Regions:
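Short, basic/aromatic recognition patches
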Residues: 4-25
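Generic detector of well-ordered alpha-helical segments enriched in charged/polar residues
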Residues: 11, 136-143
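Generic structural signal for well-ordered alpha-helical scaffold segments
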Residues: 14, 18-21, 60-64, 143
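Acidic, glycine-enriched active-site microenvironments
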Residues: 29-30
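Zn2+-dependent cytidine deaminase-like catalytic core
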Residues: 34-136
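Phosphate/diphosphate-binding glycine-rich loops and adjacent basic-rich segments that engage nucleotide
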Residues: 141-151
Length: 151
């Protein structure tokens, strides 16, 4: 994928994240866009009102089998562990056969931290940093809550 396409798709994911910003309880509003192996958008999602479902879940459910070999653009590191049971987003991405994840910024929350490492251990190519400045601004309040032990 080209850097230009990466920036455009991350911009789309960040726009999705802004839709529910402040409406997702203690969870951050995340945006996710899934491309198939040919580079076509096959799914997208934003964290649901109240914090569930996660953006990756919505996008992967929409993409279905078309996600195989594709790329996921996610505004915040996919969770490594699930607080409410079920599979974590990093596990769901792996099980869907995603080949590459482009993540704007890592997540310091204990349940998410390590999601990138889990994806890489599964053989998924992960790139971090496209859209980082915008994501850092979007998640500033969430990051402060995590560091203060309130999230």
């Amino acid at each position: 994928m080209s850097r230009r396409r990466d920036r455009r798709m991350m911009g789309r994911a960040l726009a999705l994240a802004r839709l529910n910003h402040g409406l997702t309880a203690e969870n951050p509003s995340v945006g996710c866009v899934i491309l198939d192996a040919e580079g076509h958008i096959v799914g997208d999602g934003v964290t649901g009102l109240g914090g569930r479902p996660h953006a990756e879940e919505i996008a992967l459910d929409e993409a279905g089998a078309a996600a195989l070999g594709g790329t996921a653009y996610v505004t915040l590191e996919p969770c490594r562990e699930r607080s409410a049971g079920g599979s974590s987003c990093s596990t769901r991405l792996k099980e869907a056969g995603i080949a590459r994840v482009v993540c704007a910024i890592t997540d310091p929350h204990p349940l998410a931290e390590g999601g990138v490492t889990a994806l890489r251990k599964a053989g998924i190519r992960v790139e971090i940093g496209i859209g980082r400045a915008t994501a850092a601004h979007l998640y500033d309040g969430f990051f402060r809550s995590v560091h203060a032990g309130k999230a």
